[in-house]
Each structure stands twice: as C-alpha cells, then as structure tokens.
Amino acid sequence: MVQTVNLKKAFGARVLFQDINIKLDTGKRYGLIGANGAGKTTFLKILSGQEDATEGEVQVQNGKKVGTLSQNQFAYENNTIFDAVLLGNKRLHDAIKEKEELYMSPEFTDEVNNRLAELEIICCEEDPTYEYDVKITRILEDLGFPAASHQDLMSTLTGGNKFKVLLAQVLYPKPDVLFLDEPTNNLDIATIGWLENQLQHHDGTMVVISHDRHFLNAVCTNILDVDFKKIREFSGTYDDWYIASTLIAKQQQTDVSKKQKEKEELEKFIARFSANASKAKQATSRQKQLDKLDVGAIQVSSRRDPSIIFKQKREVGKELLTVKNVSKSYDGNVVLDNINFTVEKGDKIALIGTNGIGKTTLCEILEGNVKADSGEILWGATIQNSYFPQNATDVIEGDITLYDWLRNCDRDADISEIRNCLGRMLFNGQEQEKKVNSCSGGEKHRMMLSKIML
C-alpha cells in the first residue's frame, strides 16, 4: 500500500537515514522506534507528504486515503468541536458548509440549484450512508464529550481535550493509511485504552511513533527500527523486537570477535614464517587469506543510555509539602475544591485523573506558576523542588546554545557542573554548542532533565 524507493534524508552533512526501501502492507500496524534525533518524526513526515526527502520517493497506492494526526492543538480554535472532527474529511466538510450557505440564499436560481446538485454528489461520494453526524457524535461521546458540548468552540477546551478532538478527526474518516506521531501524549489512562481498541481494529496500514512500550505491544504487528542510518523491519511486538535485536547485536559481536582472533593468528604466522624458506609458500597462502578477510566493525548505534542522577543538596525533614484547603476555578467552573494532602519523605505519588480534571492546574499551583483562589501551599524549610512541565518542548526555546540555556537556569553553577549535567543526558562536546531551537522534542525533554539534575 505504501512503498519507499531509495529514500534518503540529510541535513547538510548529517545523514539521518539512506537507501531506505521498505513496503508497508495492508493489515499491518507498524511501530516506528529509535533514539531521540534518529529521524523517526522526519521519516513519518516524509511518508505523509509533509516533508520532502533528500533523495528517493514515497509511493502510495492509487485511491487510498491517508490520515495524519495533527500536532497543532491550536489550529482549530474558531471551529466547533464537531466541525473540527468533520474537517478530518475536508472535501465532505467543505461541501456541507457550502450547501448550508446556498440554502440560506434569498433566491434559488438555476445556478444555485445546479451547484447544490454537484455538492450533493460530493456528499454522496464521501458519505454514501449519510451517517457522518452519527459517526462523529458517537466517537466524541466515546472520548468523553457529551452531545451538548459538540457545538462549543475548540478554544474553550484544555490541551488534553483538544488532542482528543484531533484523534477523533483522524480516526473518524477511517483512512486506509494512518500516520500517528505520539498519539498517547496528554491522554488519560481510560482514553489510551479506548485508542488501543480502535487501532487494534484498524484494517488498513498504520505507522505509529510512541515511547510507550505497553502501547506498542498492544497495537503493533510489526516494528520499524531507525538505527545505523537504516530502517529495519521486525515482525511482532516491541518486546519481540527487543529480543531479536539483542540477539542480532550479540551475534554481530561474536562474529567480529571471531574474525579478529583469526586475523591475529594469521598475522602471527606470517610474521613468524615469512622469512623461512620452507614455510614461505604457507606464509604467502596465509597472506592471501588475510587480504580477503573482512573483519568489519561493530556498528555504532544511535541508542545510548543516559545517566540520570538526582542529588539532594541537603537533608530534608519528615514533611516535605503540606497542601491546605486549596481551591481553583476558571470562569465559574470549579477545577479544585478544598484540596488537602501531605507529602512525606520517601513518598512517590502518581497524580491520575481524566483530561481536564485539574492535574496540571494542581502542579502549576504547587510550582507557583498559577495562583490558587484560596488555601495554602507549605513547603518544608529545606526543600528545593523541581518541575517537569507538560509543555516542556514549548518552554525550551530560543536562538542560544544548549550550554547557554542551562547556564541561564542557574548562574551560580560551575561550568564543569553544567557540562556534566548535559553530558549525562548524552549532549557531549560540540552537541552542547548547538542551538536550542534545532532540538527535537525528545532532545528538549532531555534538556529539561538536565535542568532538574542541575
């Protein structure tokens, strides 16, 4: 259904991947995995036509509809929730809206009637059963939007709920080919379960990027691994890929070690007997073997393990945080109502709940970024807290280097300490001098962890 031919993508001298020739079949759901910056999102954008390849081409079977999950939560602020979903089929959306305008015309001329007939044909082609409104209503209700809210503007929704609408937008038309870049971001647990069920029943072709191993195991039939500037396909789930790739790496190590040992033995024989007349013929034979021997090398993977170390600067007491009678409302809508809890030394707490219920609001209040309507936030006297915000990729921006960005976070820190924190998150040497605004989303998340460690 989708095929790449000699695909290559490079940014200047830096090659992300090259010589990519893969075929994505109907009925298969591919998980696209790889290290931060390896080129996953770039490859997905090339597949979906959002970005050009440096070389090669992408071929999509004629007549197949492609759906791509939008990453811009603010693109439909002036649309109703219902219309934002309907825009998943833009041809149908435009025809319906034009029909509505024409029906408001003061006069039904022949020209108007002819155009209405043309629009009716388009609607019939795109929605033969005339059930688009039923389908959209059902999918929105499944995602937690009651029917009464479907005419609300997108601008009234939280970030998490906007993302749910974008999911509905790409899933509602049932495209033959589905491209999803991190679809579980900002979703609550219940919605992730719903999405898993929807994707398991997708009978076309799907490519999804996710860092959620459990999600990949639940929805994928195949794995596409971006590494070594190549994209390799594996059958099975993420766990199947992990087992197979580990075995391949071990086998490669064994093969290289075996050839290296053979090379050393040949070199020793040649050095020992090349000057010996009786052994000269054998030495010459060994030299020919050595010349033909290709030891090769262990391929350098783009995957590297970070070293995340959170060190306390001083000892803390028993009570770290006390929250007393905290309440918060937005436009009359109560989000937090008289919240009370205590965090003690050693606690590890998960904050869960549906989208829009107030989890991020509570975190922002604790951090001091949002003011509560009432109540108290009492931090322990020796506490120094850190915060990883939901919008980390938006917070980390600017035309400055990674080093300068982290330096601005703590002007009192030693130069070596700053470079150490960057190095632990795999930003070494010249990488520390690259611009923040050139970083991928995953790299910005690593930057935020560097800040927290600092």
What label would you give each PLM region?
Residues 1-256, 305, 309-454:
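ABC ATP-binding cassette signature C-motif
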Residues 285, 303-305:
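Short Gly/Ser/Thr- and Asp/Glu-enriched loop/turn motifs at secondary-structure junctions
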Residues 244-297:
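Intracellular alpha-helical coupling/juxtamembrane segments of multi-pass membrane proteins
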